[in-house]
Regions:
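Membrane-anchoring hydrophobic helices of lipid-metabolizing enzymes
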Residues: 1-70, 104-109, 115
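Surface-exposed charge patches
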Residues: 2, 81, 109, 170, ...
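Catalytic core of membrane glycerolipid acyltransferases/transacylases, capturing the structured
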Residues: 62-122, 147-160
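Short acidic/polar alpha-helix capping motifs at helix-coil junctions
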Residues: 19-20, 42-46, 71-74, 90-93, ...
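Non-catalytic C-terminal accessory region of glycerolipid acyltransferases
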Residues: 14-21, 58-61, 85-86, 122-250
Length: 250
């Protein structure tokens, strides 16, 4: 895989092949697990997706909303079901509508089976209105490609200049909403553990790009430790940097 060569030029061919083999196994498992989630009970999800929720629950106890910055980390679909079961917050899942209406409805059904709610990325302001009086945890897949490379923060990410969306940080700073990072660790086949880390308690006191920089560093560390757990096959590097897109931030 060309992405692995770019990200890990210091690894041998055999080492990259080993990562690719584990990645494809996880990719296949992810597909099978999504099918299972169509009918899985809450007790099944609770058994297969675990973690210490004390960090987000403390934010809830303080009477605050929070923002969760995730990544394309297996198995994010199980997280959509596991987080609402364990979190005191109402979990709002920001999602990109799928072109096929049939598939879109299927994934909407899966992702909301345990109490989470969906907010379309195409109209977040309207989508969040029904929940304005709730203490919510807003889940954002923050390593998503931006809609346009000009509207992004650019970082050197695994040997390639890479754009990151601005919205996750700007929304948190505007509302002074505590930011939490998280990752999913595969304990064994079909079993995952979520690990939280407080990214920023008071975003309004930070400078623009500070939170995104922390997130990029967090994501980089995670991928280096668990390279087989990240979705290498998605087109993360489809944009090439140009001077008019702005400065490189690391």
């Amino acid at each position: 895989m060309s992405n692995l060569f770019q990200a890990f030029p210091g690894k041998t061919v055999e080492e990259r092949k080993a990562i690719a083999k584990k990645f494809y196994r996880n990719f296949t498992d992810n597909f099978i697990e999504v099918i299972k989630l169509i009918s899985a009970s809450g007790s099944f999800v609770e058994k297969h997706f675990t973690g210490d929720f004390s960090i987000p629950n403390k934010v809830y106890d303080e009477g605050k909303r929070c923002q969760l910055m995730l990544s394309h980390n297996f198995n994010w679909e199980m997280a959509c079901l596991g987080i609402p079961i364990n979190s005191k917050h109402l979990f709002l899942i920001v999602y990109m509508p799928i072109g096929s209406k049939v598939i879109d409805r299927l994934f909407m059904k899966i992702r909301t089976r345990t109490g989470g709610a969906l907010v379309p990325a195409t109209d977040m302001r309207t989508g969040m209105l029904p929940y304005r009086n709730n203490l919510t945890m807003l889940g954002l897949v923050a390593d998503q490609n931006p809609g346009h490379p000009k509207n992004a923060y650019w970082f050197n990410f695994f040997g390639k200049l890479t754009p990151f969306v601005k919205g996750a940080e700007s929304g948190a700073r505007r509302g002074n909403t505590p930011v939490i990072f998280c990752k999913f660790i595969k304990q064994k086949r079909g079993y995952y553990k979520i690990i939280f880390e407080l990214g920023e308690q008071n975003p309004a006191t930070t400078q623009p790009t500070d939170i995104t920089k922390k997130y990029v560093e967090y994501l980089t560390t995670f991928i280096k430790e668990y390279p087989e757990m990240w979705l290498w096959s998605h087109r993360r590097w489809k944009w090439d940097w140009k001077p008019e897109y702005g400065e490189i931030l690391n």
